[in-house]
Amino acid sequence: MSEGTIRINKVLREFNISLERAVDYLKDKGHVIESNPNTKISDEVYNVLSNQFAGDKGNKDASKEVGEEKRKEKEALRVERENEIEEKRKVDEERQRQEVIRAKAVVTGLKQVGTIDLSAKSVIKPTIIPGVKAEAKAEVKTEAKVEAKTEVKVEVKVEPKAEMPVAKTPEKSEQPKQHVAKETLVKEKIFAKEPAKNVAKPIVGKTPEATSKPSVEDAPVDETHETKYTKLTGPTFSGQTIDLSQFNKPKKIIEPNKGGAKPAGAGNNNNNKNKRKRIPTKSGEANATPRVPGTNLIRPNTGGNATGGGFNRANKPGFVKGARPAIVPKVEPTEEDVKNQIKETLERLQGKGNKSKAAKYRRDKRDTHRQKSDDEQRELEAGSKTIKVTEFVTVGEVATMMDVPITKVIGTCMSLGIMVTMNQRLDAETLTIVCDEFGFEVEFITTDLEENIEVVEDSAEDLVHRAPIVTVMGHVDHGKTSLLDYIRKTNVIAGESGGITQHIGAYGVELENGQKIAFLDTPGHEAFTAMRARGAQVTDIAIIVVAADDDIMPQTKEAISHAQAANVPIIFAINKVDKQNANPEKIKEKLAAMNFLVEDWGGKYQSQDISAKTGIGMKELLEKVLLEAEVLDLKANPNKPATGTVVEAFLDKGRGYVSTVLVQAGTMRVGDYILAGKNHGKIKAMQDERGNNVTEAGPSTPISILGLAGAPTAGDKFNIFADEREAKAIAAKRTQLMREQSVRVQRHITLDEIGRRIALGQFKELNIILKGDVDGSVEALSDSFSKLSTPEIQINIIHKGVGAITETDVMLASASDAIIIGFNVRPAGNAKQLAEKEEIDIRHYSIIYAAIDDLRDAMEGMLSPEMKEEITGLAGVRELFKISKVGTIAGCMITDGKILRANKVRVIRDNVVIHTGDIIALKRFKDDVKEVAKGYDCGIQIKGFNEIEIDDIIEGFTEVAVKRKLK
């Protein structure tokens, strides 16, 4: 990027404005820039935008700051919420851990049962069990420090006595000791943690410790050891019964344990879940160490001794193997918990829960796709109501793009007061109005082209008077060309085929007084509507020629409508007044009925009775033309590049493409670069209507030029450029646009069209390649041929152009199965031999009537014939003869016409047709006959119908194919 410049898209982001807003504001301030985000602007333009839109920048910055503050607030709230959740989680974990600890403390407190009478400890001597010393040491390590010290002292005193063998203990005392030890062991396994599993072992050895010296340390032992209930597991027997149900109460909590770890010794039997079975052991097994939980053979990845093994509670955090799950007291829910629970319930009911994030993602994705498809459909529907057109679009192309019958488009234009034809081009304003009538919007794509053509503004001192441009219009054979022949002192009619004008002519005439007039001669045939419309658009004054011995004809009315649409003055020339049956007053009366009151009758329209053959009234007519021109005060600037309109174009075999143009402003010179439509070139030569070479042509001058690369379309505007590159660039762009337009106009066959053709049954197409000598004639023929199309036969003009018939045209006709029509042209080169080889039909015409009539006849020949019924005779039933295995025979008398054996018949009863069929047999007496005439009787048997009755009428008829005519 060069210093001092900046791209406008960066400025737009800085000031928070749109590109259109910036471009419009700069345009108002006198700075015209391209509407492109990558356009570079200078510091001066930047300052202009800064002065205007600094407020928008401030608003954007303020909005950004507010957005940043909101983002920070949201982030702080999110962090605070996460901290609260984390803190709450820690509190819950701590509370759960405390509950577990409290539960353990409560369970161990169950040992403090004060209902056991210890007075019997002096009666029964203690039984010393070997191995108590080692187990006692293990207990010392698991107890608290204070308890450990106390029990160590006791063990020192008791140990010598423990070594003494005591064998006189009764056998019955063995069972209570074993019973109490096992019971205590079960309790410890259920409620204690894993390190406390061995606590039950030394309890057996503590009993003799307490009973060994009751008199020496009676009080201290009671203080320290009564709360531990070390006497419960002693071997002494007091004779009292201990209620074990108080120790079995917590077992109810174990019932929900499904698949988890079971208490030691429970095994895999489901019957042991509720109550443990007591198994008495032998004396030799009394000292056996109880099985430690977890020592069973357990397979990997299973749930221990639990049934099923599918759920392993050991994976839970805080789980202690061998201990019961903690009893967590029910906590009263807080208000926040209640709100969260209600919110989760509502979300589940509304389908917004978090039970499946994947399902929610898929649902949101479906909604997004559905919304996107709906938006695309709406855009497509909106786009279908918008048509993109260029300045070259015609009425037929517009009708095709809107998919509207062309007759409706032409009718709409006529209702707006615009007389148009199928191939006539519409200006932007008219096109917008017409499309709006059908609910379409028009988008023009050629605005950038007009900006490249420099328009020179005319100053008052540069304007000079120019000659008027006069167009002569009227019905065919009313004398338009004869009028110009008399004025120009020439004989144009002799050169026209069939004595009618088929080309638009442009002539310059200099009168005796030195004044000049430019005349345009338009054809009067109905096919040349477009030519008349072009003549009216470029003219200053219109002369409507009406034959005094004729009437106001359709083309006369059309010419008047064209002149009115172009808003040009009208002069009526009533011709052929020299004839005996001429009646000019009748013509004026008809004009008055059309709201055209001539001056002779007190109106504002000028009229003149003339005779183009004898010259009657010609001088007065020219004077009225000059008077009208003087009133109009026509001026133009000759000191600028020429602009004007293409009147006609044709291909001259020796000179190339020749274009007849009418200069409306400026001056055209040999050597100038010209652009007309999509064609461009350098002017090589200029000639007037008489073939004289000229070097320059000023305003209101009709001239023929050579040098264009192709034949421009009649009606195109032309411009003169000083630089060939500029003209070539615009021509290339227009060619591209016209190609795009042709593709846009193409319509492929639709399903509805296929259905319509199938419904018709006999749908046919006629493809035509049309070549002519001049563009105006080609356009007129194209219009006329297209109007001949019917619902059953469609005319497709697949190609039309100016020039000779070439081999390319023949190959195109062969590929598309088309016929070639040449109007005043012949095949070039080997085109004729190729057409004979490919069996392509080439038709040549020089009169437009003949071409249209031949095509109409060809279309009528393509039409399927129409079947009509002709009644041949009537027969009355007089008698019936019923024959078995044959059927019913009707004895008839022919009352009208004749009945033929090949006829179809109808059976009519009480003026109602009850059957239609064929005749199987027609006999007269016993002979088979082909026909029976009126007045004779006969026997008739009808196929498949035996319900005939007397007095029925049999009507014989035949179907005849009749050639159809185009409507």
Curated annotation (Swiss-Prot):
Residues 201-320, 349-382 are annotated as: Disordered. Its main location: cytoplasm. Residues 521-524 are annotated as: G3. Residues 575-578 are annotated as: G4. SUPFAM superfamilies: Initiation factor IF2/eIF5b, domain 3, P-loop containing nucleoside triphosphate hydrolases, Translation proteins. GTP binds at residues 474-481, 521-525, 575-578. Disulfide bonds: none annotated. Residues 465-635 form the tr-type G domain. Residues 354-363 have a biased composition (Basic residues). One of its GO terms (molecular function) is GTP binding. Residues 364-382 have a biased composition (Basic and acidic residues). Residues 499-503 are annotated as: G2. Residues 474-481 are annotated as: G1. It is found in: Cytoplasm. Residues 233-248 have a biased composition (Polar residues). The keyword rRNA-binding does not apply. One of its GO terms (cellular component) is cytoplasm. Keywords: Cytoplasm, GTP-binding, Initiation factor, Nucleotide-binding, Protein biosynthesis. It comes from the Bacteria. One of the essential components for the initiation of protein synthesis. Protects formylmethionyl-tRNA from spontaneous hydrolysis and promotes its binding to the 30S ribosomal subunits. Also involved in the hydrolysis of GTP during the formation of the 70S ribosomal complex. PANTHER family: TR-TYPE G DOMAIN-CONTAINING PROTEIN (PTHR43381:SF5), TRANSLATION INITIATION FACTOR IF-2-RELATED (PTHR43381). This is Translation initiation factor IF-2. The gene is infB.
